[in-house]
Amino acid sequence: MASAAAAEAEKGSPVVVGLLVVGNIIILLSGLSLFAETIWVTADQYRVYPLMGVSGKDDVFAGAWIAIFCGFSFFMVASFGVGAALCRRRSMVLTYLVLMLIVYIFECASCITSYTHRDYMVSNPSLITKQMLTFYSADTDQGQELTRLWDRVMIEQECCGTSGPMDWVNFTSAFRAATPEVVFPWPPLCCRRTGNFIPLNEEGCRLGHMDYLFTKGCFEHIGHAIDSYTWGISWFGFAILMWTLPVMLIAMYFYTML
C-alpha cells in the first residue's frame, strides 16, 4: 500500500495534478465561451460586413472563423488534458502539449489578425467616409449593397453620413453626381421622421434646419460594432492565451516528472 502511494508520488505531485486539472477545466469552459462568442460575430448582428468587404479588410471575420475552430479545439484538448493529468501517462501528456501548442498558435493568429484589421477600419473615419462617398447611390452591386446598409444605419441610428450631413456637401460623391445639391444636399433619409416614417418637414431638412435633420454622424455606431466584434475575438482570445501559457508550462514540468 505504502509502495503504491510512493510510486504515485514519484509520477507527479498531487498539487501539480490538481493545478493541471483546474487549469484545463477553466480552459475548456473558456473555449466554449469563445466558440459561442465568435459564432455571434460571424452572424454579423450589426450587419456591417459590407463595409469591411468593400475595403478588403474583412479579416476580422476571418479571425472569427479561426477562433471558432480554436474555441472548440480548446474545449476538446483541455478535456483530454484533464484525463492526461489524472492518468499520469507520459504519452498522453506529450500528446496534450503538442495539440495545445498547435491550437495556441492558431489562436494567436486569430487575435492578431482581427485586432490589426480592426485598427485599420476604425482608427480614422476617412476610410469609411471614402467608401460612403464612392458607393452610396452608385449603380453597381457593391453600390446597391452599401446604399442599403447606409440607409438602414441612418434610419435606425438617426444619423447622417460618417461625421455628419456636411460630408455630402464638402466632398464629391456618387450621390452628388445623381442628385444635384440644389435638389437635395444630402440623402433624404437624413431627415427626421414621424412614427409613420414621414419626414417632419422635408423643406426644412433640405435647407439644413437642425430640428428636421439628423446632425450626428454614423461613425460612432460603426466603430462600436467593429469594436464589439474585435473584443469578442481578440481581447477574450488574448485572455485565454494568457491563462493557457502557464498551464502549458505546468504541463511541461509535469511531463518531466513522469
Swiss-Prot record:
Superkingdom to which the source organism belongs: Eukaryota
InterPro entries to which the protein is assigned, alphabetical: Tetraspanin/Peripherin (IPR018499), Tetraspanin_animals (IPR000301), Tetraspanin_EC2_sf (IPR008952)
Cytoplasmic topological segments: 1-14, 87-91, 253-258
Residues modified by glycosylation: N170
Membrane topology category: Multi-pass membrane protein
GO terms, biological process: epithelial cell differentiation
Tissue: High expression restricted to ureteric urothelium (most superficial cells); low expression in prostate. Expression in normal urothelial cells is lost in culture. Some expression in tumor cell lines derived from urothelial malignancies.
Keywords: Disulfide bond, Glycoprotein, Membrane, Transmembrane, Transmembrane helix
Gene Ontology CC annotation, any one: endoplasmic reticulum
Extracellular side: 36-59, 113-230
Localization (cell): Membrane
TM annotation in the entry: 15-35, 60-86, 92-112, 231-252
Function: Component of the asymmetric unit membrane (AUM); a highly specialized biomembrane elaborated by terminally differentiated urothelial cells. May play an important role in normal bladder epithelial physiology, possibly in regulating membrane permeability of superficial umbrella cells or in stabilizing the apical membrane through AUM/cytoskeletal interactions.
Subunit structure comment from the entry: Homodimer; disulfide-linked. Interacts with uroplakin-2 (UPK2).
Family (UniProt): Belongs to the tetraspanin (TM4SF) family.
Protein name per the record: Uroplakin-1a
Organism whose genome encodes this protein: Homo sapiens (Human)
